[in-house]
Amino acid sequence: MEINNQNQCVPYNCLSNPKEIILGEERLETGNTVADISLGLINFLYSNFVPGGGFIVGLLELIWGFIGPSQWDIFLAQIEQLISQRIEEFARNQAISRLEGLSNLYKVYVRAFSDWEKDPTNPALREEMRIQFNDMNSALITAIPLFRVQNYEVALLSVYVQAANLHLSILRDVSVFGERWGYDTATINNRYSDLTSLIHVYTNHCVDTYNQGLRRLEGRFLSDWIVYNRFRRQLTISVLDIVAFFPNYDIRTYPIQTATQLTREVYLDLPFINENLSPAASYPTFSAAESAIIRSPHLVDFLNSFTIYTDSLARYAYWGGHLVNSFRTGTTTNLIRSPLYGREGNTERPVTITASPSVPIFRTLSYITGLDNSNPVAGIEGVEFQNTISRSIYRKSGPIDSFSELPPQDASVSPAIGYSHRLCHATFLERISGPRIAGTVFSWTHRSASPTNEVSPSRITQIPWVKAHTLASGASVIKGPGFTGGDILTRNSMGELGTLRVTFTGRLPQSYYIRFRYASVANRSGTFRYSQPPSYGISFPKTMDAGEPLTSRSFAHTTLFTPITFSRAQEEFDLYIQSGVYIDRIEFIPVTATFEAEYDLERAQKVVNALFTSTNQLGLKTDVTDYHIDQVSNLVACLSDEFCLDEKRELSEKVKHAKRLSDERNLLQDPNFRGINRQPDRGWRGSTDITIQGGDDVFKENYVTLPGTFDECYPTYLYQKIDESKLKAYTRYQLRGYIEDSQDLEIYLIRYNAKHEIVNVPGTGSLWPLSVENQIGPCGEPNRCAPHLEWNPDLHCSCRDGEKCAHHSHHFSLDIDVGCTDLNEDLGVWVIFKIKTQDGHARLGNLEFLEEKPLLGEALARVKRAEKKWRDKRETLQLETTIVYKEAKESVDALFVNSQYDRLQADTNIAMIHAADKRVHRIREAYLPELSVIPGVNAAIFEELEERIFTAFSLYDARNIIKNGDFNNGLLCWNVKGHVEVEEQNNHRSVLVIPEWEAEVSQEVRVCPGRGYILRVTAYKEGYGEGCVTIHEIENNTDELKFNNCVEEEVYPNNTVTCINYTATQEEYEGTYTSRNRGYDEAYGNNPSVPADYASVYEEKSYTDRRRENPCESNRGYGDYTPLPAGYVTKELEYFPETDKVWIEIGETEGTFIVDSVELLLMEE
């Protein structure tokens, strides 16, 4: 048979002899040797992946001592046939010769290893082993590049992966046995570095080349898809499945036997034989076949049953459609029912084929319709399904054997024991018109993907998270990158991933380290949960940039800080992650004393080295926080003195160096909280209720506790200014730290504007489980080496309505950009922490303010624009302040008789003082709106005038002989008869209320006989009758002021009486007045209702000045003055006592009498 078009598919079952493959003019007898060898190798890697003689000899017997030139030629021919590209004779012969040479060299290597293993202290054998390793390593370094010759990378891929696998295995050998062979530590470490680097190099080449070949086979027609799918299946087995084991060669990450699972699916050929009965364009297209046959990424499932429907055409009956029932890993009760594939034909009764976790279907024998090439249907007439104990037949058995493509992995035992794949699903491609297609395509999973996630007590167990039984809302399964052995999971927003059920097979309780293989586009955090509380926080450091493709180097490992002890045979796990994190698998590492010590040391070495930007430890990585350094210090301190004392000392010195570098780059003064308010102009300033506490199970160093407050006008606060001299021009800075727990904690960074976040971080109590003993050390210190829980690093949003919901991580950070610096202006950056609610609280420490990066591009332009806007507003403010200050000073000066401000003018009254004070408070930017204890640009002139206002009030109070005449102290100093009340009105004013005519309030006052006094009363009368304030002596000499609710002017013949409309006297007092310092809003028209939730520095609105007016900013001396409503009047009379005592009496005839103040003032001489 000739092939006229090399791009045309020639399926093996189109031929008169389906067991032959035609390649050009050659015939290759196939027992699918490549698949046999590859699956045998996979089985070996799965079950015997332990360094030593057994592995070395096994690799020789399976591959390098078994395969000869003819078998290597079959490896090359398989791909040549698929991609219709023949390797040039020279390149082909060179590749086979190189492979043969490597085989011969490896036989010598194995023989030398066997001799050394019998006498490991023999110097000659040790030297021989070094010679053989060096020769083997050099040969592989030379040979492997020849297996990726340009233009033949795809054709050579299956032999490339075998050579790469061999190279990684001998590099692991020297990493394990090198010291006993006589290599020094530096050489061993260098070869281990080669190993870890080449794992990525070889993996990426295999995956990239596989994808290149696959893309090359994409086409338009169904025949193109058949070749495409065959390439995908065959190279998944011969290349990608082997690559999935490459990370296990990292002996320091996987020091013991490791159980790996392959969760990918492979699809057998479409039963399609009559392609010549109709033009190719009339068949389903390439894309239609791919969409119909290949399932989208999904959680791993296992077959429970098929329900098969039979259809017919002419005299032929065939598989016309089916339903699939399946179950997820670890659960057999919740069946998943597929949609109907094909049609629900009724030519014959439906047939049900069953399977189970313990009895899987491992083989099919299909009878393809029209083997005589006359059947008008391309499909299946019958299938025999073989499981591990019996067989089931749909209509009839046939010669098309699934073992031809998916042979057993172990031919030395019966197929029911040595099978490699289990049937998991079947899809369908249908065409009804013309020559009919009823193409059932079986999909298979590797047997390593077990129906239950069993965790071994003696192996490292890798469980892909795609084996979860439930996928959380918002989580998704995405196509794997090719080297993970299956698909992976991710989320597009913060939330749960999906529930994974595992079974512990060993004696319980058993302890394991929990590790995750992941990729992340940024530094992320997550939470690991299982059915026994509590949850465990875990970090996912950045491994790649957003938008980059997933490569081998994109994936890393992250481990829970301490092992977890499990006491139940079955547990369910879930992982709470942020967006941009990709999860491959969870790994369970059994804990033993020696292994734990070695594992702890290796982990400590990795995390210590990861602190620095380079191996010479000259600088810290920017994303290494001060809190993280403290935790690394704890990790090093907990290393075993018995196993690794010298290494512990070395690591401890490195961590101390890292801590010193962290202190040097931190621009905050006293970051360790040695004291608050210790120095007036340096360090931390704060409210008196803040406490400093020593290290505990969360913090290694001091931390601060901020309690709540009962009055939001008096918040709990902590602040510090970063001096201008420490800042660089056009640079971004970052404030960051660690919060143990908080509620309503407000964080501010202020320069040109305020960056603001409200952070709520629920704590989890003690970090130690209740079952842990010795939580406290012998001297009362926290035992940081005791097994402890991890903090929950990211939590659901818990902000109340109307508040900005910032991040809720224990780790917080806030950026601010600095433009031009000016030492004379000394603008600096204010760092503020504030709580203004009763339920608020916070515990925080490890605070840092450090340089992040210079500003470039758009960020630079934005900060320049913000700086210009700020300076324009500052200039406007200065002009305004000049005018306002002049008016305010004139009002204040008018209250006094001289510039010494020690005497008031005779006619100065309370309304004049309040009016002057209001003018003073028109001076804006006296204090920061965010925290009114921090002085602003106009603080000096404001406090100058405010001090004189205080003096005026003091002098005025001294002139009033009546004690508690404003009733601010209730009824203190007053004699009371009957029922009266003192009520607070209009926020801050206390007034005397006399509601009954029989009630009376009086006070005895000492005076100077013969001197003149002014009695001044401000009051309001409700209802009928009169309110009276009387002044008298023991005998006669009585005067009174009367108040009523009528409009007639009252005449007092014996005295000079003035009736004043009090509200008019207060001049500009319109509505409620709050004595506070305004921000920019009033002058520039900004909306004061906009909350102070400033956006990211990357958004333009971040630089818009939107500071709110703070109603709690006081005049720093007395309570807010609120003018009285209309209706209150002030009346005066002159009184000349004849004795040294007078009585002031207040009463009424009916209705209600409300008195604001009573004053008795000595006249000037």
Curated annotation (Swiss-Prot):
A GO biological-process term: symbiont-mediated killing of host cell
UniProt keyword terms in alphabetical order: Sporulation, Toxin, Virulence
Keyword match NADP: no
Keyword Transferase: no
Transmembrane stretches, start-end: none
Superkingdom, taxonomy of origin: Bacteria
Pfam families: Cry1Ac_D5, Cry1Ac_dom-VII, Endotoxin_C, Endotoxin_M, Endotoxin_N
GO molecular function, one term: signaling receptor binding
InterPro entries: Cry1Ac-like_dom-VII, Cry_V, Galactose-bd-like_sf, Pest_crys, Pest_crys_dom-III, Pest_crys_dom_I, Pest_crys_N_sf, Pest_cryst_cen_dom_sf
Family membership noted in the UniProt record: Belongs to the delta endotoxin family.
Other noteworthy facts: Toxic segment of the protein is located in the N-terminus.
PANTHER family membership: ENDOTOXIN_N DOMAIN-CONTAINING PROTEIN-RELATED, PESTICIDAL CRYSTAL PROTEIN N-TERMINAL DOMAIN-CONTAINING PROTEIN
Physiological role: Promotes colloidosmotic lysis by binding to the midgut epithelial cells of many lepidopteran larvae.
Protein name: Pesticidal crystal protein Cry1Da
Natural source organism: Bacillus thuringiensis subsp. aizawai
